[in-house]
């Protein structure tokens, strides 16, 4: 998918900027609770761990890649964010906010899951400029980084 070819290098750059203190996963099974539909394969996941062999909590950001229409990916991204929240709870690494993004590579839309409340940023951000998108992801990965260790 063309969008994934644009999204992946952006997320790799976030990892590089943050000194490889985060991990990036793509296309892996993320079955958390099949009974409630929290199963499937995510497009991209960023975790606040330098481990790259397996997903370790806390999972912080989910990115859903779409060919064109971003709206078509919002529901799926939110479900994956809920799965990430549950994953963190099971691993006893709760963090207050899980972030999400739906992108076709040149347009990016962002979502926040705080406790049980989902907030969708109605703005759609273009790429380029890449600096703005990078700054959003860096903020997400650093937000509450210190607090998450004590929660």
PLM regions: where:
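Active-site metal-binding core of divalent-cation-utilizing nuclease and nuclease-like domains
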Residues: 22-52
């Amino acid at each position: 998918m063309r969008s994934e070819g644009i999204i992946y290098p952006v997320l790799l750059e976030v990892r590089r900027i943050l000194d490889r203190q985060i991990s990036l996963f793509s296309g892996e099974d993320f079955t958390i609770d099949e009974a409630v539909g929290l199963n499937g394969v995510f497009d991209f996941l960023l975790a606040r761990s330098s481990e790259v062999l397996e997903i370790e909590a806390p999972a912080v950001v989910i990115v859903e890649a779409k060919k064109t229409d971003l709206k078509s990916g919002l529901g799926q991204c939110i479900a994956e964010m809920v799965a990430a929240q549950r994953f963190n709870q099971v691993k006893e690494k709760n963090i207050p906010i899980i972030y999400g993004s739906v992108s076709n590579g040149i347009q990016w839309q962002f979502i926040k899951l705080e406790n049980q409340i989902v907030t969708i940023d109605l703005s759609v951000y273009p790429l380029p400029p890449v600096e703005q998108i990078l700054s959003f992801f860096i903020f997400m990965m650093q937000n509450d980084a210190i607090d998450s260790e004590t929660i």
